[in-house]
């Protein structure tokens, strides 16, 4: 989807809105981390004799005079081989070569951005990998963006008819249908288009939703409507993904399943390093490199 021209101008209470968004993202982080630790505790199948994982949090600040920072929350456990749940709130100025690509930054390079980003790589190949992020960005304009997508690593489960796929899609659809400012059909198609490995001519997973540059007019609810929808995307994810994990994490798997999982993880690496907009944004705005690249899986192979 082509980037739209967003209206220039900010509401008088933009600072209060920034603070509300930041608090929401950080609260969602804490909710998800607690939920994922509960999944670690609840394992009864393979590897249940191992100690359950716990998140390790690390705060970071931007360097070289740039403003803001964030928190990395990483866990390696018996359910999640690697999962990162990160929040950040950063501000400063876009570099000259990056300004023209960002709405409202061409003539004024100042920006503020806050958000949450999550990628989970489970141990059990029966449990799909997942990605979720939502964010608020402010330049001389303002908008929300984000989404969530599911990546089953076994070919027999990587279908739209699979029960996990249907459950995930339904959760995202409900989150969208409850808000007039959201367009589920467009966001689902955008996700399919965005999470596509062009050099392989194949999708990364089974999809989900993806949206960006959400800036509704005051007549359709404005910032409040956009923020309400973005919160419901986070809530939908926090509800549906643990259900999917619990329905699969006690199942047995084979060495062939593990091999297929590692090969599928290679597609994750290829996408994140070649195409991912968030990775490029973070690296070009002086983000925390360790946090940005923590989305990469811990063990990968290529055939």
Swiss-Prot record:
GO molecular function: coproporphyrinogen oxidase activity; metal ion binding; protein homodimerization activity
Binding partners and assembly: Homodimer.
Binding site for a divalent metal cation: 121, 131, 169, 199
Extent of the signal sequence: none
Active site: 131 (proton donor)
Positions annotated to bind substrate: 117, 133-135, 286-288
Site, as annotated: Important for dimerization: 199
Gene3D superfamilies named in the record: Coproporphyrinogen III oxidase, aerobic
Catalytic activity: coproporphyrinogen III + O2 + 2 H(+) = protoporphyrinogen IX + 2 CO2 + 2 H2O
Enzyme superclass (EC): oxidoreductase
Alphabetized InterPro entries for the sequence: Coprogen_oxidase_aer (IPR001260), Coprogen_oxidase_aer_sf (IPR036406), Coprogen_oxidase_CS (IPR018375)
GO biological process: protoporphyrinogen IX biosynthetic process
Function, as annotated: Involved in the heme biosynthesis. Catalyzes the aerobic oxidative decarboxylation of propionate groups of rings A and B of coproporphyrinogen-III to yield the vinyl groups in protoporphyrinogen-IX.
HAMAP family for this protein: Coprogen_oxidas
Cofactor(s) recorded in Swiss-Prot or TrEMBL: a divalent metal cation
EC number(s) given by UniProt: 1.3.3.3
Localization annotation: Cytoplasm
Name this polypeptide is given: Oxygen-dependent coproporphyrinogen-III oxidase
One cellular component term from this protein's GO annotations in UniProt: cytoplasm
UniProt entry keywords in alphabetical sequence: Cytoplasm, Heme biosynthesis, Metal-binding, Oxidoreductase, Porphyrin biosynthesis
Source organism: Rhizobium etli (strain CIAT 652)
């Amino acid at each position: 989807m082509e980037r739209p021209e967003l209206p220039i101008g900010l509401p008088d209470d933009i600072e209060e809105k920034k603070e509300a968004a930041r608090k929401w993202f950080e609260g969602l982080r804490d909710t998800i981390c607690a939920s994922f630790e509960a999944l670690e505790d609840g394992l009864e199948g393979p590897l249940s004799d191992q100690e359950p994982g716990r998140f390790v949090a690390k705060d970071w600040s931007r360097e070289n005079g740039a403003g803001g920072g964030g928190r990395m929350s990483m866990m390696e456990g018996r359910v999640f081989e690697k999962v990162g749940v990160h929040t950040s709130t950063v501000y400063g100025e876009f570099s000259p070569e990056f300004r023209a690509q960002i709405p409202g930054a061409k003539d004024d390079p100042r920006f503020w951005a806050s958000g949450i980003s999550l990628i989970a790589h489970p141990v059990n190949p029966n449990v799909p990998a997942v990605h979720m992020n939502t964010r608020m960005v402010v330049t001389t304009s303002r908008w929300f963006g984000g989404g969530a997508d599911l990546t089953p690593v076994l070919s027999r489960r990587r279908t739209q008819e699979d029960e996990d796929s249907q459950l995930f899609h339904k959760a995202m659809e409900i989150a969208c249908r409850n808000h007039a400012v959201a367009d589920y059909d467009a966001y689902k198609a955008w996700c399919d288009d965005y999470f596509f490995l062009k050099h392989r001519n194949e999708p990364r997973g089974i999809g989900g939703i993806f949206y960006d540059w959400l800036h509704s007019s005051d007549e359709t609810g404005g910032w409040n409507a956009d923020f309400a929808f973005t919160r419901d995307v986070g809530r939908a994810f926090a509800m549906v993904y643990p259900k999917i994990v619990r329905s699969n994490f006690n199942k047995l798997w084979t060495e062939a399943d593990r091999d297929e999982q590692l090969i599928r993880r290679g597609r994750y690496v290829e996408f994140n390093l070649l195409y991912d907009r968030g990775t490029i944004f973070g690296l070009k705005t002086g983000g925390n490199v360790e946090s940005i690249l923590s989305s990469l899986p811990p063990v990968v192979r290529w055939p």
